[in-house]
Amino acid sequence: MNKKALAVILTGAMAGTLLAGCGSSGSTTASSTAASDSAAASTEAAAAASTAVESTAAESSASDTSSKNLPEVSSDPITITMWDIATEDPGKSTMETAVQEFMKDYPQVTVEENHLQNDNYKQQLVVAMSSGQCPDMYVSWGGGPLTEYYKSGFVNDLSDLYNNYDHPDFFDSAIAQGTIDGKLAAIPFNGISGCCVYYNKTIFNEVGLEVPTTIDELEDCCEKLKAAGYTPFSLANGSKWTGSMYYMYLVARHSGNDEFNAAYTQENGGSFTSEAFVWASDKIQDWVKKGYFPDGVNSLSTDDGQDRQLMYDGTCAMMLHGSWQCGSMYTDNADWYTQNIGVFRFPEDAEAKANGVPQDVEVGTAIDTAFSFNCWNSDGTVDQNKLNACYILATQYINNDEYNMKKIQLENKVLNINGYDQYITDENMKTVNKIFQDASNVQLWYDQYLPASVTEVHKNCMTELFGLEKNGQEIGEEEDAAMQAALADSNS
């Protein structure tokens, strides 16, 4: 076990930084909004959901499960400790139902399910790992923390199970995000949480604009919007991670995943001062100077909905934000949202595309949540029987049709499994689903991927960038120094 690496993570977790940011806050907002909508929905909607489940959910029955190609679980008693973050309904009851169905079909297995609050979850998980009490099955998100769990010996390699036995037809991007060093480290569930551009269709029609597909076209739209009296982008960067969305997408469009991956390792010349990062920074500061963002972006709060308000009152025409904003805007004013708001994927960098840079890397998380497994015998070998049971639970019960239809109907989730798009009713969410279904990979939010100490530096750099306090070279040097320090701590 790499105890030093865990200590570094624990320090960051106790500071409360690992969960801060766009990915985690977005997932919470989307779920709570959807839950509120569902609670207020009529029994007719619930009946429709039930009908849809019954028409497609044969996989949840014991007979159908037994007919599948699944690993063997012995008749010997097994106890699985399981940690999740489903503390409120409908998610809590949906998870518990899946677990109960599994135990009914596998009576020799007892699942001790623990629901933990999201805010302190990572801190509690690392404490459990450090004290030898890591659960057998636990929620993870991918990125830097999962990599450290894997390196520290708390993650089973699921590649052989996944390659040889039945599983849901996950998006390629979801499996890629759950893979570390070529080994599958997590089974996704609960869908995606992605980033996209919201735009006011009414304003676009008024100004005579088409949805831009390249960054050059996007900048042309911005100039025409400015000329018509509109601020192109709504942005509330008081939380800092909101501005990072522009930075992440511009880097991804200019270099795919390559330059970020190199900067993360700080190997073979990798640096946050590399060409893509400086180019993205220069582009953002050019947009700031041209007035593409509201005045005082660093003092506006997304938690208070100030970015959405600038869309509602017609001040701004576009907003780059997380997919959870679909639910937030719908809740605020369903009629206005339906009539006025559309979404499109972040435009491509035509020059980079001509040079062979992939333009289908999206930003967000292709695994809203996932399960990783920690099934080992006392001698350090894999407890294959328990691992088989965990794999079946995660792929055939959590992730069966009944479970997934509840996620769509009751929580407005966009799943990362092929074949469910037909059940999405929100046209904008259909677009989000298509964007991430077609993605070759998903760049996890930097503030979830980076070590905790680097995350804080990165977020502060976004304030400096949008405030024109420092340029791309300068903030890149700050991020490099933080990354090098974090790597030194984890390796010492």
Each language-model region and where it sits:
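Hinge/lid segment of periplasmic solute-binding proteins
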Residues: 59-72, 141-196, 210, 219, ...
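Short, solvent-exposed loop/beta-turn-alpha elements that line the ligand-binding surface or hinge
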Residues: 72-73, 157-170, 210, 254-279, ...
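Extracytoplasmic "Venus flytrap"/periplasmic binding protein-like
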Residues: 98-173, 177-179, 202-213, 309-310, ...
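Extracytoplasmic/periplasmic substrate-recognition and gating elements
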Residues: 100, 104, 110, 290, ...
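A structural signal for short loop-to-beta-strand junctions that line the ligand-binding cleft
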Residues: 128, 136, 166-202, 231-234, ...
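Extracytoplasmic/periplasmic solute-binding protein
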Residues: 180-189, 195, 219-269
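Glycine-centered hinge/linker elements that transmit conformational signals in sensory
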Residues: 224, 266-298
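C-terminal capping/gating helix-and-loop segments adjacent to ligand/active sites or protein-protein/ligand interfaces
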Residues: 409-415, 430-487
